[in-house]
Amino acid sequence: MKSGRLFTRTCCLLGFLLSTACGSRTEKASPDYPEFKMIVRLWPDHHKDSALREELLQALKKYPDFCDEVWLCMEFETFSKEAHKESARAMAVAAERLRNAGIGVSIQGITLGHGDDFESGAARPHPELTWGNIVDARNVRTVTSSCPRQQAFHDYLGETYALYAGLCRPSCVWLDDDLRVTYHAPARQLCFCDTCLSLFNRQHGEHWTRETLVEALDRNEGEGRLRRQWISFCQQSLAEVARTVARAVHEVSPGTRMGLQHANFHRELMEGRDWNPTLDALEEETGLAPASRPGNGFYDDHAPRGMLLKGYDMARQIRRLKPSVREIAAEVEGYRHRATGKSPHGLCVESMFYLAMGATQLSYAIICAASEPMQWYADNYFKSLSAWRPFYEQYVAFNRGTEPGGIDPYIGPDHALRDTEAGEPSLAWIATGAGDMIYDMATLGLPFCPDGNHSSALIMDASAVQGLARD
C-alpha cells in the first residue's frame, strides 16, 4: 500500500525534529496545565444508531487507555427543528451511557456550513433555510452555507445549540472549522451580500457596492486602511456567530466551556492574523477560557511527509493563540476513515509530532464515517494508540513550558497589505505561499519554528519579503 522504506525514513526524520522541538523553554506564569486527553470525534450515527453506539462502547471498554472523551456530533445535513430534536434526544441517551462507562462527553457542531458539496453531498436547497446565503466577491452564491450576518440564522443557531447542550450538558461545545472566512464552495470568501455591504457601509460611512469595494481592495485604498477594515469586519462576522452560540449554550448549561476548531489558514490573509476575535467572544459570553483544536488536511498517509506540512502549519496557529488558551487538541484526521487511509503506526507517529509542535491534547477523527467494522478500528487504531499513550503522557509532561526551536519561516503581520503587482489577478493579495519552501527543507533535518518566540534565525523567500513593505 505504501513504501515501507520511505515511511521508515520519515519516522527517523521526525525523531530528529522532535529532539529539537523542545529547544526553547518559556516558563508560564501559572503552574496549572491542562489535563492530557485522547479524544474521539464522532458523527451523528454513533448516537442515533443504537447498534453502532453499543459497538463503540464495547470497543472503548476493550481499550480503556485509548479514549478519555468523545465529541458527539450534531446533525449537519438538515435545518429541520424536528430532526434536531430527535437527534438531541438520542444524543442524551448516548451521553449518559458514555459517562457511565467513565468517558467524558463534549459536543461538536457546524455553523455556516463547509460548502455546498460537503454536508449535503449535493448543492440542493433546504426549505428550512429561509435566510441569506454567502455571496463572494465574484457574486457566486452558495445554496447551503449561511451568511453570518443574518438575524434569522443567529436565531436558528441559538435555538439549535441550546437544544443539544440543554439535554446533554457537555463538558465543552466545539464549533467546527466551517466558521471561517474562506472556502465555502462554490464561494471563495465571505461575504459580499447586500446585508453585509450595507452593514459595512454603515459602520464606516461609505457607499461601496460589491464591484467598487473589490476594486478598491485590489488597489489597496487608503494604503491598507480599507483592507484592515474589511478583514476586521469579516472577523467580527464570525465572532458574532460564536457569541450567539456561546450565549445560548451558557444559558442552559453554565458549566459548559466553548472550543473552536480552526484550520491552518494563515495562508488565507482575509482570515486575519489569528482567531482571537472569535475566541474572545467565546470567553466573554461564558467567563471560561476557550479551547482550541488546530489543524486541517493530511487525510491519509500515502505521502507521509504531508504530516510535516500539517504539523508546522499547526505550530504557527498555536503560537498565535493567547496564553489563556491552554487546551489545544490537535486534529488527527483520517477522512474518509478507511483502513487504506492511514496505518495504525502512522497515526501514532503523527500524534507525537503534533504534541512536539505545542498541542496539549489529541483529537482523533478516524472512525467518523464508520467505513470499517468497529472491531477493525478497535484492534488496529485503538490498540496501537493505547500502547503509545504512556509515551505521550511522559512527553507532554516533559514538554510543559517549551515551544519549538530552530528557524522561523517569517511571515510579516501586515502581509495582507502588500501592493499587488502588474499582471496579478483580482484579489491576488488575499492568499500567500510565503514560507512554503520549509516543507522540503525540513526533510534534510533542519528544525523550524513557525512564529517562534525564541528562533535562532529567520528565513524568508521572495513572497515573504514582498509582504514586509508595511512592517
Language-model features, listed with the residues they occupy:
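Aromatic-lined carbohydrate-recognition surfaces of secreted/lumenal glycan-active proteins
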Residues: F36-H46, S106-I110, W174-D177, Q229-R273, ...
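Mature N-terminal, pre-catalytic/accessory segment of carbohydrate-active enzymes
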Residues: A21-I110, T142-T144, Q151, D155, ...
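Hydrophobic targeting/anchoring helices
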Residues: Y63, F118, S171, T182-Y183, ...
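Helical hinge/lid and interdomain linker segments adjacent to catalytic or ligand-binding clefts
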Residues: S426-D471
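Active-site-adjacent "subsite" loops/lids of carbohydrate-active enzymes
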Residues: I107-C168, A185, G205-I231
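Active-site neighborhood of glycoside hydrolase catalytic domains
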Residues: L167, C191-M258
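Catalytic domains of carbohydrate-active enzymes, especially glycoside hydrolases
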Residues: A51-E77, L167-P170, S351-Q361, D440, ...
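The substrate-binding groove and active-site-proximal loops of carbohydrate-active enzymes
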Residues: V40-D49, E75-E86, N139-D155, E223-A239, ...
